[in-house]
Amino acid sequence: IVSKKIKSSFPSETKVILTTTAGELCTFDLNTKKDSLYHEANNPWQNIVLQSFSEDIIDKIEILTIPLFSENITSQTISHQERINKIKNEILRLNIPFKINHTDCFALTIVDGLSNSESFLTEAVYESGRLPCLLIGGSSGGKLDFQESYIFNNEQATRHKAVIMLIKMKKNMKYGVFKSQSCEKTDLSFLIAQSNMLNRSVQSVLNSKGNRIVNFVDAFCHHLNCSLADLKTVLADYTFAIEVDNELYIRSVSNIDIENKSISFFCDISFGDLLYLVKNKEFVSQTNIDFKNFSARKKSKPIGGILNDCILRRLLNAKNLNSLKTFEDIPLAGFSTFGELLGLNINQTLTALFFYEVENEEDFYDEYVDNFVHKYAKFSTYFTQREIHKYQLIAKVRTAVINSLKDAFPLIKDMVEILNYIYEDTTQTNKLIVEMTKKFEKFSNDIVSNV
């Protein structure tokens, strides 16, 4: 009802996209500067923040709605590739009415924040090859009971879908891509051996020293020298991340199941992923440093921006939110998300678009946009690389098992000879032992020849 009323307030040709949030971010109320970037969201709130863009900034826009097939996702039985293919087929059917060039076009994306499908979407996008541009945005938010989350796609409120705004900029407009995380990588990492991508839980990892599969919680407690009872307290100062092209993509913990010894995440973790432990840092100074570095080679200030800010940044830094003044002179808006997108799914991160008016496009530089072809290739091959890691892990475990069998062969042969000696007077038993010995020797030779 609310979304329909908002839509009806604008001319029919105006495209309106709305999302539920876990809190809103905004620097200006029309022409009045606000005291805090973060709107209050501790108690039930009914804020509506609207951000509009004129035809002087945006040349063309196409709204694409993609089904995610995520209804009852944790109980579904279709294979991973079947799920990717279903989403990819929906993408291949899309009508894209203009040519996509990554220098002036991007895909601002909002994914159903309760669908557990952000990575499935991105993998399908790269497999389809239909959107060769920046994929940036976030997952729709909502109350922290995680019961409802909606996206309005200019026509209706939707669930279990992703809404992509394919936006082409005017010739005198440029966009820059900003990313900020308040963490640093430690020396500790885990190679995932057993996980569930649908409920986003991890059960076991590979012990690098002995090529043994061990419980993730046990391994983590061992490395940090803490008890099960203290694990949640110790983890309060840490989170996890994968690494793509030397950049961290955070995977935040959603729950620690002490009884069943498993850890759940707000992003899916795959068998074969290399998961790094990262330590949290103070977020105000880090955001300031990141934005200073981002702005260093830009000759003008941005005329506006869109922020996708993880709900965990709001929750973990609640006492310092009002101290963040980095963007106070820039007209921008955004929301606290249930996850972010920047090429791949990510947590505990601020991803943002800033817009610039330029006279000569050759004078504008953005590290992300100028190196986009390289980054796109890394995002696209991430999923293939993950498959390679799976096979490498299987090969490691298989080799370890074979080596263990090889070590046991002499002992087993000795045992057979002892049995033969004990029962040498029993004709029938003797025949069985001879037959077993021949089979074992053949098995042994086959194994050794294949190692």
Tell where the protein language model's regions lie, with residue ranges:
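Hydrophobic alpha/beta core scaffold segments
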Residues: 1-451
